[in-house]
Each structure stands twice: as C-alpha cells, then as structure tokens.
Curated annotation (Swiss-Prot):
Residue stretch of the organelle transit peptide: 1-41
Protein family membership: Belongs to the YME2 family.
Keyword Mitochondrion appears in the UniProt entry: yes
Limits of the RRM domain: 197-268
Signal peptide as annotated in the record: none
Gene: YME2
Gene Ontology terms describing biological process: mitochondrial genome maintenance; mRNA processing
Role this protein plays: Plays a role in maintaining the mitochondrial genome and in controlling the mtDNA escape. Involved in the regulation of mtDNA nucleotide structure and number. May have a dispensable role in early maturation of pre-rRNA.
Protein's name according to its UniProt entry: Mitochondrial escape protein 2
Organism taxonomic ancestry: Eukaryota, Fungi, Dikarya, Ascomycota, Saccharomycotina
Subcellular location per the Swiss-Prot or TrEMBL entry: Mitochondrion inner membrane
GO CC term (a single one): mitochondrial inner membrane
Amino acid sequence: MYRSGLLTSGGGSAALTALRAIGSRSSLSNGKFIWNVGKRFITSEIQEKDQQAGESNTATDTGIIHKTEQETLVYFDNVYPRDTSLWNPAQWYNLLLVNQSREAVRDKITEFASPPSNPIHGLELRSTIPVKRDGGVFATFLVPSKYTKAEVNAIIQKNTAEESSKSIFSFFTRASAFPVKGFPWIEDLRRLPTNTIKVLFQGPPLTEEEIYSLFRRYGTIIDIVPASDSVKNASVRYKSLKGAICAKNCVSGIEIHNTVLHIQYQQEARNFVISNFFVNHTRIAIPVMLAVLSIIAVLIFDPIREFSIEQKITHIYSLSWDNYWIRQIRNFTNSTVTSFRNYWGVNENAFAEKHLWEERIEKVNDLKMWLQENNNTFVVVRGPRGSGKNELIMQHTVGDRTNVLYLDCDKLIKSRTDAKFLRNAASQLGYFPIFPWINSVTSVIDLMVQGLTGQKSGLSETKEAQFRTMLTTALTSIRRIALKGYKSVIVDGGEDVNVKEEDYLQQHPEAKPIIVIDRYEGKSEINGFIYKELADWASMLVQMNVAHVIFLTETVSSNQQLSESLPNQVFKTLVLSDASKENSRKYVLSQLQSFVDSKQKSKEDIKITENIEAEKSKITDQIDDALEPLGGRMLDLQAFVRRVKSGEQPTEALDKMIEQASEQITQIFLSDKVDGIKSAQAWELIELLSAKSVVSYDDIVFKPLFKAAPELGIVELENSGLITVSRNRGVLDKIRPAKPLYKAAFYYLVNSQELSTILRTRYLLKVITFETGRIKKWEDELRPLGKSGDPKLFRGRFEYLSGKIETSNKVIVASEAEIKALSERKQNQK
C-alpha cells in the first residue's frame, strides 16, 4: 500500500535514500514503546521523476516535508482560523483584521518558540508549511548542538503555551505546539476538520488502551471505537476540534508494532431532518414552508409598507409642497405677504372666494363643519361630470390639511392587467414595496405543487385578495396616524386622568386623516370589485372613528353599494349642480376682473389688460350671449375664462369650445371604429337633443335601433358621457346632454352642412346594415317553414315575418334614397 505524503530526512539523494530505506520494527523496552520510523509510504519513483523533470519538490506541491536529522518538526495549532464549514465567517474576519502574511506567521512562530523571556539560544527556524484548512503550521527548527531534540520540543511546547496565554483574547487565540511523531501528509483536499478521526491500520490493529495512550495527549477523548473483525479501522472522538486536528497532523504515518497508522477526519453522517421531512412528507412540508415564508415576509415587509403609507398621507419626509416643514415656511411667508397686501387694501381671502360662486362657498363651509363635528364623518359629494367636485374638495375644503389620502377609482378601473392594477393601487396608497411579478411565478408553482401533492399550495393570490391586503395595511397606518398624539394618561389639575383612544379621537377630529375617494361609480364590468372593497374599507374606517371619508360620485346608483357596506349609517350628502345663469355670469366676470387687478403691468400683459378695460362693456354683452349655450358647468366655465384671459373674444372662445366638443363627440361616438349600433343610437339622440333640450325616454323606447334593449343602450351612452338620464322611481325618465355645452355641439353637428352630410350618411349606412341583418335573420327563420308539408299551419308566422321584412325593406329603400339625395346635394354644393 502506498501513501501519498511523507516526511523525509534530508533533501535530494538523501531523501530518496530515506524513502528506499525499510524501517525497523518497533520494540517494547521497560514497558515503553520504542517507535522507529522508516516505513515506506510513497514510492520513490515519483520523486525520481520529479527530480529528472526539474519540478518543485516542496511540501505544497508534493505533500512531503523534508528535514534532516539535525532538525525537529513541530506542529503549531490555532495560528489560522479553522475551516469548520464552507461558509465560516471567522475566516473572513481573520483575513480582514489579522496579518496572515508569511513573514508575520514566521515572526509569530519564532515568538512562540523562543521568546525573550525564555529563549532557546541558537534555535533557527528553517521553514514553515501552513495548513490553513486545519488552522495550523508545520515548522522545522534546527536543533542547537547543546540541546537534544526532546529538550527543544519540551521548551517550545512550554513557551508556546505561556506566550499565547498572555493576550486578552487568549480564550480564542491560545495556541499549542506538539512534536510531529509520524509522517504528515500535507494535503489541501476539501475534507473539513471534525472532532472525530478515523484510524486506518496498515497491519495488525492496536488495542483500545494503546489508542488511548497514543492520542490522549492531544485533547480529551469522548469515545473510542476500536477495530473489529468486520471493521478494520478504529475511530477516536475528541471533545473539541483541536484534539482531532493535532492528533491527525502529529500522529499520521507513525509505525507501531509493524503497523502504520493512517489518520483521516471522519465525516459524520449528517441527519438531514429538514430535507428528509420535505422529501417524505411533501403534502405537509410544502404548506408549512409557504406559511413560514409568508410569516417572514410579513415580519420584514409589513412595517416598511406601513411606514410608506404613512409617508404618502403625511408627507413628513418628502421634499414636496406637502411636507410639514415646507408648509410651515410657506405659511410664514404667505402670512407676511398677506399682511402687506392687506395693508395696501388687497383682500386675499376675497380673491380666493372669487374662484367659487355663492352656493359653492356655502357648501365648502358645510363640509368643513361636518369634518369638525366628528360624528362618523361619511360624506357623499354627488355631481355631474365636470361640475368641479375634485376642485371643491381638494383645493377649497381640505387644501390646508396635511393628512389627506386621495384615491382615484378611474385609474384602478382602467388597469387592463393584474400587474398594472396592483402597481396603480400600490402607487395611490403608498404601498411599498410590492412585487407584482411574484403573482405569475406563484401561479406556476401552485400548478406544480397541485400536480405533485394533489392540492393547491395557496401561495398564489388573486388581485382581489392582494388589494384587500393593501387596504388592511393602509387601515393600520391610518389608525397610527390618527393616534399619533394620543397619550393614555394625562395630567389634569395635578391628577392623572386615563384617556381612552375613542375619547381622544372624538375630541380631536383634526388628528384623523381625510380619505377622498374620487370617481366612485358603484359598478363596472372590469375590476368592479374595487367598489365593494373600498366601500367596506371606508365603513371600517368610519366605524373605528379613525378617519373622515369623502366619496365623489356622478350617479345616485353608488349609494346602493355604500348602503350595503354601512346599513345603519346616515350619509351626509352634498349635491353639486350647474350654476344658474346669474351665478355663472358673476363667476366669469369676477374671474376676469381679478385677472385685471392682479396683473402686473409688464410689457407682455399691457395689451391684454388694456383691451379688456377698453372693451369691458362690449365683452360683458358677449359674455352674456356666450353663457347661454355654455351653461353653468364648472370646468367649462374655467376653460372659457382661460381662453378669454389669453386674449380671445368671448364669442371666439365659445365657438372654439363648441368645435372642440364636437370633435370629441365625433371621435368617441360617431367614428367608424365605434360599434355600428352604438354609433347609430348616438346619432339619433344627437339629432333629437339638437332640437330639444330634453327628450323623454318614451320617445326612444320604440325606435327600431333601441327596441331590442332600450335601457341598455341608453345607460351605455350615459356611462360613456354623451348624455345624462334622470330617473323616476328607478325607471329611466328624461334624457339630456351630458353637459350644457354638448347641446350647442349637437346643434353644430346637425346643422353644419358638411359635417351633417358625412355623419348622416354614416348613420344611414349603419341603419341599412342593421336592417339587413334583421332581414337575414327572419329569412333564415322562413326558410325551414317554407319546406313544411302544410303551409297553412304556419300562415300566421309567415304573415308576421313577411310584414317585418317589408317594414325593414322600406327602411332600407328610404335610407338608400336619402343617401343618394345627400350625395347629389353635396355634388351640387361643389
């Protein structure tokens, strides 16, 4: 048997001679073992080949340590950090903080072996061979002539123990030195040290007593398993790694009683409890693992998300105008400027109120009073599209509040994918971090787990569940904001008074955040679940009395959804309608007057302001004429004012707004991309509403285009924003344009010869297509009836279908005739 490492005497030919030598047998003298070394462990041919090739024969390259008879080999332990595992952090710690260069290690070994306090005169350190995996170093010393090897080894052991114990970190850094008795094999295999060594016998095995006597000096032995007939090797288990490492490096290769001992670390059979549990009990293990991962995710991410939502509401750490400190600076500077303006006779509050008409100012005051009453504030602000609901709430009612959360349902509804929906919801709530892509991954994992275990893992969540989780986290953050200034005990007149959270919230309405939910409709074909979730969430906020909730909606139908979530709650309802002509006139004139008063007479503004002043009476008359078709819709009035401020005449501004509205209607409702029936229905209503301001539902219900599903068609156009419908006890009643400006736009589309010809032709073609489809359906029904044996049996049905076909055919003929007439008229105009 050959061994792949060896301690040899001398170098070159002397080493080869030692390798070829046959060691003498060990003998017992006076009860003591006499260990004579000389057994061949590695073939000498390898060194001969290396020498012939001129290759290195160092211990690092060959695993063999060379020394002469005048040298002694000592193993120093705990010089480097031991590799107890592949990811031992101690090795990185020592690598960064301890000097481990070759020179530093040699100085350290010399200091241990021959310190100034007890030097060995003439001792020379010849070489050091590090074994970093084991944390030690082999050192060869030249023995001085006046010492024997035994004396030098004993002094080195003593000095090392004393010197390494002087450090304040000696508990961790204490080193040991042991003479090397065997032939160490210097290898860097990935055999990590353990506290158990395996002793392989090349020859008759040693007894348990012999093994103990040989290995005990290196450390406390816990157990010895001697060799048996079936197992030819023994194992020695030490209390610590140190004993096993020193024994392996100092004894390996020794020969006793013609038996050579080869020592290796015994890798303990690891009991992979967790992996076995997963392999053998997948149905239990996978849900448990997922539950643990979920708990860890909650513990890590939920506090971050709650903080992020608080930041979204309070803006404490954001560099924006909503930041608390920036608001304080703005308030200070604004108050200073306001003081100067008031001194010069300019009333800022009066100027701000000019942005609202009288009824709106009263409604703002009512809203502010409701927020201060603190009696389960649940407000529903209802008004048609463009009535200024958002501006009324966000600017004039809660504009000075620092704890407002604004949610826009329309952005959530229009999210086409689950990932986009979750990102939009998280953005509005301030919910961060969020990982939408995980949902796709977990869905795949869920399918795999279901295939393996036969049951779903429950890892994947629907967007409804994830949205509900976001709202729950937001509720926790909102409650924390509301109770930020709460103290359970206050001092009143020298006495401690206990205060409940409910009492604190009741007494401090200003501490509660305001939640504004805009464009709440109650139902939708896509992502309609958000209305139910938001209503339930808002009801919890109000019932817990931790927030004020304001819903902005256009229709009455949303009240039904809110009533289901809060069945015992009386809503405070605020209805916004179009302004009267008088209020619209006052609003527009006040805006233009304030514009003139506030303008600085710069070179760019002189012309505009002078024109307005010079033609004030003329402009006033034009404004009166423009307000008739413009109506009292807030957004339209603001757009009109902006145009006039930019230098347009009122009539010019009105004409451009009508053209813009007409273009919008054409693109949304009358283009070729729109469904044919819907487009034809829209044109019929446009023609009717261009002549009358109000059309009764009874006038529509029996028209061919609406007869199949009249209510569905009307409601769809209402939801699209073309018309608005009033209801009488839940039944459709009166139909009006969605806003007053649309009345003028309808009239413009119908009476513009060029546009009306094109749009009317499109309408007639869609009517022809519609009627042709109906005729085809009836003909398909007639065909099998005509093949029946007795025509008299289905005469009634024949006559009915024939009459329907005749009526539709007349409509087609009339439509084609009208198209021909329109075409001829257009040719004549050219």
